[in-house]
Amino acid sequence: MMRFVYRVQNLLAERGEVLNDLQRGSGVNRTTLYRGPQRKQTIAATAYYLGISAEDLVAGTDVEEVWNRDTSEY
């Protein structure tokens, strides 16, 4: 699970504009993502919102590959 959490944190850091959009639109903030008591759940929910599956994160699949997939695969 920790690998999953760190992978999501790294992906969010790479996509700072996505994090900013989430902060404005859904009340997710940096404290919740990185230090909050439900950090893992919030990060998992954020990854799901971004269209990144747990399998892709754990496997280390390139995020651009995930986002460029045909939506019919999901």
Where are these regions (language model features)?
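Recognition helix of helix-turn-helix/homeodomain-like DNA-binding domains
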Residues: 27-41
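Short, charged recognition helix plus adjacent turn
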Residues: 10, 48, 56-74
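A short, Lys/Arg-rich alpha-helix, primarily the initiator
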Residues: 1-21, 25
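Helix-turn-helix DNA-binding elements, focusing on the entry/boundary residues of the two helices
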Residues: 19, 40-43
